[in-house]
């Protein structure tokens, strides 16, 4: 037998769920790296967890290390000896090489060639050794390499960890791993484990991976998180069928309850129907954030959308057979939570949205109050409303009035008691308060949707009306924070400006709105007129970089369009997609290769050209047939009315043939300066015209 199963359990105090889930994804990679570092070829690696333990299971862990050769290269032999024929032995430099390696026999030296030079050389053979002596060092290095964000020290231990470690149990090939002192964490190892707390608090000895799994299974510990998840989902499904309900499975919440349980059980509780007068979001958020409960909905026909049910799913870690006692305890806690929510909500309804003291809340230090921000957004919203009036399906005067009202009350809920308790309900509560105070429904909905999209694939504002309110918020935040120098760098983006910028582009693209990242940014900056001065090109560039996240496409195609003067968001996207369609079409393969080659020559000729230089040319100075042929083909494109971008790109790529012939037969740098200048001016016009679709030299396919 050359290998055996290795199991390592790290027994800890309860691990915080979110920190555990974040780092769990990285654990297999980190363990693989430690094995590779020691040239250990192991079989399949599995890592399991419960809130109280991490378990590393490695199939076919080798009993012996591999025999390895370690090579050392010294100084060139020309400078390592006292004389050239080496008869007088090694000099200080040569001796130093061997002494550094702890070798005393210098008489039988070896040489090797490195970088075409003969140098002193020594090879050290590492014989096979038992791997059992490597296991604890690997485990300790693994623990030290885990990053949970925060760590703590306990007692007089040398190392820190996210929670105190109580034991490391190693089971491998019948070897004895008992009593190994782990000074770093302040304990001696035991080949033992602990089970579910309701089954006992003492260590239970185990002598093999098989025995370990049997002990846990017998004592209500489901080690595999996938099996715990499956148990929860199966029990929820049974409750849905039995009670004719639908349970909303929140993925993040499911992951969390899996991480905080060792033997989960899904139980159905209920709350007083009187609480259903609260907005659904208050109830579901309170259940999720405070109690880790899943929301329950009434089962309806396919034509009807489900309504919130006065029930909830709690996932218990108890193995108590008296389930009703557990349910009753959770119902009591939820009743108190929802009673608080009713109190907060009813208090908020008493406060008119107009009277919210926004001036008392600082937006960002140095950037004024929420009232200042609201006033800046109002100016931006007015500009956008006038610009997009044809898409609003209402008279301009009415649109200005309603959107102005929406912006004025949009931040009022930030000072509400409910949002103070549940910050994720900002905007949502503003919507409910606006409806209760008889605001226009479009106004109320735009307050709710002002923060959309919340993530890359999240919903967008449902109308151009709401889009204007959302864009106003995003544009003001970008102007304000960039003007204050709070620009994202590296992985740091404390104000989520990358997400905010992505949302801006996505909204504009979705509704096909005209927005120029040079002209409109400049106009808005000047119109608001209160931002600290900064280089708008920095913001423009920042927004342009987000196109790489917005469009699923070869980055070089996106780059080719961004390298032109086009700054209209929708047109950039249209050009990128049209180029992609053309380049992805197999029938265009030869055409695109020929054009790439010709365009690069065209770009090289014009690379040092001053854009402000006159580009006038005269056909009368054309001497070669190929000049006339290229001009006629180019002029035909210039005078054509294309149905769309696809046909325009097709036409431009059709210039590959006359361009190739031109460069084969025409000497651009003619001795006659007038002819030379005429040819360069003509080619500059062709080059500039190409830039209407993209900077083709940037494309790499």
Swiss-Prot record:
Protein's UniProt keywords contain Ligase: yes
Keyword Transmembrane helix appears in the UniProt entry: no
This enzyme's EC code(s): 6.1.1.14
Enzyme class: ligase
Location, primary (coarse class): cytoplasm
GO molecular-function terms, A-Z: ATP binding; glycine-tRNA ligase activity
Annotated catalysed reactions: tRNA(Gly) + glycine + ATP = glycyl-tRNA(Gly) + AMP + diphosphate
UniProt entry keywords in alphabetical sequence: Aminoacyl-tRNA synthetase, ATP-binding, Cytoplasm, Ligase, Nucleotide-binding, Protein biosynthesis
GO annotation (BP), single: glycyl-tRNA aminoacylation
One protein family per Pfam: tRNA_synt_2f
Compartments reported by the entry: Cytoplasm
Cellular component GO terms held in the UniProt record: cytosol
Quaternary structure and partners: Tetramer of two alpha and two beta subunits.
Family: Belongs to the class-II aminoacyl-tRNA synthetase family.
Protein name: Glycine--tRNA ligase beta subunit
Source organism phylogeny: Bacteria, Pseudomonadati, Campylobacterota, Epsilonproteobacteria, Campylobacterales
Gene name per UniProt: glyS
């Amino acid at each position: 037998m050359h290998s055996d199963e290795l199991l390592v359990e790290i027994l800890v105090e309860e691990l915080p769920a979110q920190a555990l889930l974040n780092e769990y994804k990285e654990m297999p990679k980190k363990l693989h790296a430690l094995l590779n570092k020691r040239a250990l070829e192991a079989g399949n690696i599995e890592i399991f967890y419960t809130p109280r333990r991490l378990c590393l299971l490695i199939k076919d862990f080798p009993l012996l290390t591999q025999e390895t050769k370690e090579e050392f290269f010294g100084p060139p032999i020309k400078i390592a000896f006292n004389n050239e024929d080496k008869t007088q032995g090694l000099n200080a430099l040569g001796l130093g090489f061997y002494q550094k390696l702890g070798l005393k026999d210098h008489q039988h030296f070896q040489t090797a060639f490195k970088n075409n030079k003969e140098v002193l050389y020594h090879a050290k053979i590492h014989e096979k050794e038992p791997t059992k002596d490597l296991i604890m060092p690997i485990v300790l290095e693994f623990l030290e390499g885990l990053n949970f964000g925060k760590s703590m020290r306990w007692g007089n231990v040398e190392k820190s960890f996210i929670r105190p470690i109580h034991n490391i149990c190693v089971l491998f090939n019948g070897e004895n791993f008992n009593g190994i002192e782990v000074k770093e964490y302040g304990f001696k190892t035991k080949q033992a484990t602990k089970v579910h707390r309701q089954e006992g608090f003492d260590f239970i000895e185990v002598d093999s991976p098989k025995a370990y799994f049997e002990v846990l299974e017998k004592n209500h510990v489901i080690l595999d998180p996938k099996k715990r998840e499956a148990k929860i989902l199966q029990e929820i499904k049974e409750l849905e069928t039995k009670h004719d309900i639908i349970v909303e499975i929140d993925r993040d919440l499911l992951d969390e309850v899996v991480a905080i349980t060792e033997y989960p059980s899904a139980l159905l509780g209920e709350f007083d129907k009187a609480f259903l007068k609260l907005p659904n979001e208050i109830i579901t958020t309170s259940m999720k954030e405070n109690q880790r409960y899943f929301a329950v909905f009434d089962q309806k026909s396919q034509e009807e959308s489900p309504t919130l049910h006065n029930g909830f799913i709690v996932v218990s870690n108890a193995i108590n057979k008296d389930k009703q006692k557990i349910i009753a305890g959770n119902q009591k806690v939820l009743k108190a939570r929802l009673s608080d929510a009713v109190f907060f909500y009813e208090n908020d309804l008493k406060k008119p949205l107009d009277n919210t003291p926004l001036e008392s809340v600082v937006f960002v230090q140095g950037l004024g109050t929420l009232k200042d921000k609201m006033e800046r957004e109002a100016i931006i919203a007015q500009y956008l409303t006038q610009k997009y009036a044809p898409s609003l399906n209402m008279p301009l005067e009415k649109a200005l009035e309603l959107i102005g009202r929406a912006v004025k009350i949009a931040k009022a809920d930030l000072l509400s008691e409910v949002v103070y308790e549940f910050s994720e309900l900002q905007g949502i509560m503003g919507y409910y308060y606006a409806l209760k105070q008889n605001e226009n429904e479009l106004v109320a909905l735009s307050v709710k949707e002002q923060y959309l999209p919340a993530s890359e694939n999240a919903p967008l504002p449902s109308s151009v009306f709401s889009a204007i309110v959302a864009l106003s918020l995003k544009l003001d935040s970008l102007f304000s924070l960039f003007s204050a120098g709070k620009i994202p760098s590296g992985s740091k983006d404390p104000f989520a400006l990358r997400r905010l910028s992505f949302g801006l582009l996505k909204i504009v693209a979705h509704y096909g709105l005209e927005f120029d990242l040079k002209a409109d940014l400049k106009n808005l900056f000047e119109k608001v007129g209160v931002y600290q001065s900064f280089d708008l090109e920095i913001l423009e560039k920042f927004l342009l970089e987000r196109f790489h996240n917005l469009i699923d496409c070869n980055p070089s195609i996106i780059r080719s369009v961004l390298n032109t003067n086009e700054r209209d968001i929708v047109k950039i996207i249209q050009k990128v997609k049209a180029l992609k369609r053309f380049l992805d079409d197999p029938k265009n393969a030869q055409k695109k290769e020929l054009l790439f080659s010709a365009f690069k020559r065209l770009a090289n000729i014009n690379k040092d050209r001053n854009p402000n230089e006159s580009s006038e040319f005269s056909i009368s100075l054309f001497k070669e047939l190929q000049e006339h042929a290229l001009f006629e083909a180019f002029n035909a494109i210039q005078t054509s009315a294309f149905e769309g971008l696809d046909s325009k790109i097709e036409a431009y790529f059709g210039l590959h043939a006359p361009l190739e012939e031109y460069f084969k037969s025409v000497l651009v740098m003619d001795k006659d300066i007038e002819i030379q200048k005429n040819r360069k001016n003509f080619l500059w016009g062709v080059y500039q015209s190409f830039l209407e679709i993209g900077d083709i030299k940037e494309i790499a396919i």
